[in-house]
A protein has these predicted regions:
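Conserved phosphate-binding/catalytic region of the ribokinase-like
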Residues: 1-5, 199-309
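Short beta-strand scaffold segments in enzyme catalytic cores
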Residues: 39, 86-90, 221-225
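Glycine-rich phosphate/adenosyl-contacting loop at the front of the ribokinase-like
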Residues: 1-72, 308-309
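Ribokinase/PfkB-type carbohydrate-kinase core domain
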Residues: 1-6, 68, 93-232, 296, ...
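Beta-strand->loop->alpha-helix junctions that form or flank phosphate-binding loops
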Residues: 53-55, 74-82, 214-216
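A glycine-rich helix N-cap at a beta->alpha junction
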Residues: 64-85, 92
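Short phosphate-binding/catalytic loops that engage adenosine nucleotides
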Residues: 46, 72, 154, 211, ...
Length: 309
């Protein structure tokens, strides 16, 4: 049994705080949307499993070790004939982060439907979380994602997470809409809704298929729309924090929402925890390093600059 199962690619990451071509110090870590969510949910006290493949190499072992250290059950296949993906972050200016991928043909792109369905059968997860990144990696990874959502009785969430460098908007829309009939909760930024609905009112359209649509809009906050006899719409503003690095904020938001879902909290409380987790993430560099524990969740109620003694 596991509370949450997620699947997808995690890469070794290198980050510099200036243009990378200038050299100098760099930080080595790991990065991947699904593992970011896994770490966030695990830090909030839940049992979490992450399924993927990595190369039989040192970057792959770094990923496994890091996730295990974060109390995530890392179900990893080490591939001898494929490599661990790589991602680089650099900053051409203080408030702009540039991302470079090296992931085509990576080990994670070889994830198979048999692997995902076997994990679901073994683990009987309460929730399954998928993103639009995994099916963009390869036809095999797309089939693995579809198999996961089609063969489970668990509640499934989907984060659209469109990546233009991985596939076109047309290809993304076709695959994401194939997933939708099996999805309970959809997460999307306000500029991604057209990928999953052509309707003039995409929220109303989506709520004919899914139970909940959560829309994020950066500094404007987030909205949750739930299918009820009288459709329930909730808004939460972005919390007032000093933004250092926004990379990973969406994954942090999702992790807070899924944790609150596992705790059977109200739609309002789910959005509150999601907003809090997202706010924590942007206060430091890194995709996941500043994600909160359960004890941390109340810290942002203190005034900025407070010293807790």
């Amino acid at each position: 049994m596991t509370d949450l199962l997620t699947l997808g690619e995690t890469m070794v990451s290198v980050r510099t705080e200036r243009p990378m071509r200038l050299g100098g110090d760099a930080q080595l870590s790991i990065a991947g949307s699904e593992s970011n969510v896994a770490i966030g949910v695990a830090r909030l006290g839940h049992d979490v499993t992450w399924l993927s493949a990595v190369g039989n190499d040192e970057p792959g072992r770094l990923i496994q070790r890091t996730l295990r250290a974060e109390n995530v059950d890392a179900r990893v296949r080490f591939a001898d004939d494929a490599f661990t993906g790589f991602i680089a972050f650099d900053q051409p200016s203080h408030d702009i982060t540039r991302v470079s991928y090296h992931r085509r043909g990576s080990a994670a792109s070889t994830l198979t439907p048999d692997e995902t369905t076997a994990a679901i059968t073994e683990l009987s997860p309460t929730l399954i979380h998928v993103t639009g990144i995994t099916p963009a990696l390869s036809d095999t990874a797309r089939a693995a994602t579809l198999a996961a959502v089609r063969t489970t009785n668990a509640q499934v969430s989907l984060d659209v997470n469109y990546r233009a460098r991985l596939w076109s908007r047309a290809d993304a829309a076709a695959t994401l809409r194939e997933l939708l009939p099996h999805i309970h909760t959809v997460f999307a930024s306000d500029d991604e809704l057209d990928l999953i609905s052509d309707a003039e009112d995409p929220i109303a359209d989506l709520l004919q298929t899914v139970h909940t649509v959560v829309v994020t809009a950066g500094g404007k906050g987030a909205w949750s729309h739930t299918r009820t006899p009288e459709p329930l719409a909730i808004h939460r503003p972005a919390l007032p924090v000093t933004v250092v690095d926004s990379v990973g904020a969406g994954d942090a938001f999702v992790s807070g929402y899924l944790s609150a879902t596992l705790d059977n909290l109200s739609p309002e409380a789910r959005l509150d925890r999601a907003s809090t987790s997202g706010a924590f993430c942007v206060t430091a560099y890194g995709d996941w390093e500043s994600l909160p524990t359960r004890d941390d969740l109340t810290l942002l109620t203190h005034a900025q600059g407070t010293a807790l003694r």
